[in-house]
Amino acid sequence: MTTFTHINSQGEANMVDVSAKAETVREARAEAIVTMSKETLSMIVEGKHHKGDVFATARIAGIQAAKRTWELIPLCHPLLLSKVEVNLEPLLETNQVRIQSLCKLTGKTGVEMEALTAASVAALTIYDMCKAVQKDIVIEYVRLLEKSGGKSGHFIAEEK
């Protein structure tokens, strides 16, 4: 069985020592789904939201969040990300927004948490901007889609 890397032999939480690890190109993709009413989604897609461009704001928030993940998640390393991408896709048939993020770097540790944080904060930003018109927006299916470049190998999530 694989052990938790952030727990020492005394059961205490510690940041993993990556100093001896080789630098490799590492990449991770994550997603989040935001479900809302047809009216709220239409308002966003048609650009009629009184706070401005919801997707542009959520995209920038996700990018900023990825860069600051180490400040939010206690045992994450500060990383020099070489790429952060956040894409938002309206799914009109299900009244949802699919958020997909991509983080990439050449380094000693993975970027899964950065990708997950980017997708999560983009979703939270949509909620924040739309809560005045709809309080029961649902954020769900925040998950890692794919990661590559590390010792643990290439991971691809199963389709849901």
Swiss-Prot record:
Residue numbers annotated as active site = D128
Q: Name one GO molecular function term.
A: cyclic pyranopterin monophosphate synthase activity
Q: Which reaction(s) does the protein catalyse, per the Swiss-Prot or TrEMBL entry?
A: (8S)-3',8-cyclo-7,8-dihydroguanosine 5'-triphosphate = cyclic pyranopterin phosphate + diphosphate
According to its UniProt entry, one GO biological process term is: Mo-molybdopterin cofactor biosynthetic process
Read off the Pfam families from this record: MoaC
E.C. numbers: 4.6.1.17
- Subunit structure, as described in the record: Homohexamer; trimer of dimers.
Q: What does this protein do?
A: Catalyzes the conversion of (8S)-3',8-cyclo-7,8-dihydroguanosine 5'-triphosphate to cyclic pyranopterin monophosphate (cPMP).
Would you tell me the protein name for this molecule? Answer: Cyclic pyranopterin monophosphate synthase
Its source organism is Haemophilus influenzae (strain PittGG)
